């Protein structure tokens, strides 16, 4: 956390479907960041259930009437859009309304299957006269947000199947405000007040918990960038990091013999990174730098997990004369290491004279 005091969340229940939540303290500016994210998620991304299509007995399309029914089909569909249902099923389910007049048809007349609940049974659907009769088949599905009727139209639907606009979101209204709050001696921290009103299919508390879970899952993608996102390797691995660090080492740290060190310095090679950028041919072009010196450099670089630009990956230091497998080091009995003796700068291997 950015501050030492962990934010707290409290709930004030205003009604069965409405609560006010307070989150504090938050770093300055985070009240709006969190409030806007939660509000947008609550209004658009909370899963719910809704009617996606209907079929009315004796009706072929929505621009008609039903004998004995006061409302036309369009009005009936508009009324059904206000139906609040909850479903535990992932697959579409079917509900039925069968009513004989006279009287009103309400959502309480709907017969839902197991796992489906009608949460506003008082919703008015239609009005029947003495001869009125209404039979409706309703398909209910789960989803998120709002889906227009044109998208609910199935390609192989039977004649008389009427698609309906689906309002899946169980959240009716969300408002928030940010106030100042005090933490120790500072008074510029944020206090987020979130007012959530839902339909009867879910409580405000459950809606906020669902929104928080959705945001955590999405923000988790960014959090994984600190380790490794799927399909993307972010930053060097530990081994690569060691190699990168080794490139900046001065060649003095390689503990080369005096002749090898002096030859490289005269050539302008000062770091390990500059050395690994050379090939064996490049080094042989250096005056007084012979094969023995190249073998020494290759062994020293191998101890760091590095190699010359053209060195084969299969290089085996044990094949080099002077290599001690027990200690993993190379020594030249004919010449001391850098700093062991004076006056050796002009020492040269005979094959390079």
UniProtKB/Swiss-Prot annotation:
InterPro entries associated with the record: DNA-dir_RNA_pol_insert (IPR011262), DNA-dir_RNA_pol_RpoA/D/Rpb3 (IPR011263), DNA-dir_RpoA (IPR011773), RBP11-like (IPR036603), RNAP_asu_C (IPR011260), RNApol_insert_sf (IPR036643)
Q: Please give the residue ranges the record annotates as the region Disordered.
A: 326-353
Q: Which gene encodes it?
A: rpoA
- The reply to whether Signal figures as a keyword in the UniProt entry is no
Q: Which HAMAP family match?
A: RNApol_bact_RpoA
Under what name is this protein listed? Answer: DNA-directed RNA polymerase subunit alpha
**Chain spans, region Alpha C-terminal domain (alpha-CTD):** 241-353
Entry similarity comment: Belongs to the RNA polymerase alpha chain family.
The yes or no answer to whether the keyword S-adenosyl-L-methionine is present is: no
For the region Alpha N-terminal domain (alpha-NTD), what residue ranges are annotated?
Answer: 1-226
Q: Its Gene Ontology molecular function terms?
A: DNA binding; DNA-directed RNA polymerase activity; protein dimerization activity
How does it associate, per the subunit comment?
Homodimer. The RNAP catalytic core consists of 2 alpha, 1 beta, 1 beta' and 1 omega subunit. When a sigma factor is associated with the core the holoenzyme is formed, which can initiate transcription.
* Cited NCBIfam families: PRK05182.1-2, PRK05182.1-4, PRK05182.2-5, rpoA
Enzyme class comes to transferase
């Amino acid at each position: 956390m950015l501050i030492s005091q962990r934010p707290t969340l409290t709930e004030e229940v205003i009604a069965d479907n409405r609560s006010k939540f307070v989150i504090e303290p938050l770093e300055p500016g985070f009240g709006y960041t969190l409030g806007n994210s939660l509000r947008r998620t609550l209004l658009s991304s909370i899963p719910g259930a809704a009617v996606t299509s209907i079929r009315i007995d004796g009706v072929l399309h929505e621009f008609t009437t039903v004998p004995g029914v006061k409302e036309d089909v369009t009005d009936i569909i508009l009324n059904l859009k206000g139906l609040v249902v909850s479903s535990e099923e992932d697959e579409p389910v079917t509900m039925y309304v069968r009513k004989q007049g006279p009287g009103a048809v309400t959502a309480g007349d709907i017969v839902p299957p197991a796992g489906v609940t009608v949460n506003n049974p008082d919703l008015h659907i239609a009005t029947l006269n003495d001869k009125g009769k209404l039979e409706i088949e309703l398909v209910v599905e789960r989803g998120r947000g709002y889906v227009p009727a044109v998208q609910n139209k199935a390609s192989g639907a039977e004649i008389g199947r009427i698609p309906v606009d689906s309002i899946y979101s169980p959240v009716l209204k969300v408002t928030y405000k940010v106030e100042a709050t005090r933490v120790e001696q500072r008074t510029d921290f944020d206090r987020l007040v979130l007012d959530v009103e839902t339909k009867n299919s879910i409580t405000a508390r459950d809606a906020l918990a669902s929104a928080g879970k959705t945001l955590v899952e999405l923000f988790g993608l960014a959090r994984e960038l600190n380790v490794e996102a799927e399909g993307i390797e972010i930053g060097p691995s530990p081994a690569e990091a060691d190699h990168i660090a080794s490139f900046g080492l001065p060649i003095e740290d390689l503990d080369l013999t005096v002749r090898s060190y002096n030859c490289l310095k005269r050539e302008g090679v000062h770091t390990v990174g500059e050395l690994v950028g050379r090939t064996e041919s490049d080094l042989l072009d250096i005056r007084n730098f012979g094969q023995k010196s190249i073998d020494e450099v290759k062994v020293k670089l191998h101890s760091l997990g590095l190699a010359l630009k053209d060195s084969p990956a299969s290089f085996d230091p044990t094949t080099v004369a002077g290599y001690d497998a027990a200690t993993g080091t190379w020594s030249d009995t004919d010449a001391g290491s850098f700093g062991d003796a004076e006056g050796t700068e002009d020492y040269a291997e005979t094959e390079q004279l």
